[in-house]
Amino acid sequence: PLVSRAWVVSQGASWGDTSKPGMAQLLQDVQKYAPDQQPDGFFEFGYTEAKVTQAIIAKAISNNDLSRDGLFNAFESLKNVDLGGLLPPLNYGSSPDERVPSRDNTVYAIDPTQPTSVRDLSGDFTGSAAQASKF
């Protein structure tokens, strides 16, 4: 069938891939706080975004400034935010040149036997077109 030849290009660790420390932590947190949560890529995305928000708040606390401006300054100062392999490390900054998005991708095959119905074929990689792009 056609679905056996379909690929999806996205980002992120495969649900259940505990070789990624971030996924191992996500699964522990799901077991502890939301044991009925079904495997879901959108849940994983939200969890990852919460980790970024946590990094912003932690930086603002270390700067002793939880004001709106303090949170924004904390965001602009974040570099190499490690998400434990859920996504590649993220960089933020105060200028477009510093806010270069991740260029990594993962190719997945449709696989209904997997928790989120996709199977990682490639691991994180950056294609030549993405490497050459300028922002």
What are these regions (language model features)?
Residues 50:
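C-terminal helical cap and adjacent loop that interface with cofactors, partners, or active-site loops
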Residues 121-135:
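Short, cationic low-complexity segments
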Residues 36-43, 54-117:
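Segments of small-molecule ligand-sensing domains
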Residues 23-25, 83, 88, 135:
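General N-terminal targeting signals
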Residues 1-47, 61, 124:
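Extracellular/periplasmic periplasmic-binding protein-like sensory domains
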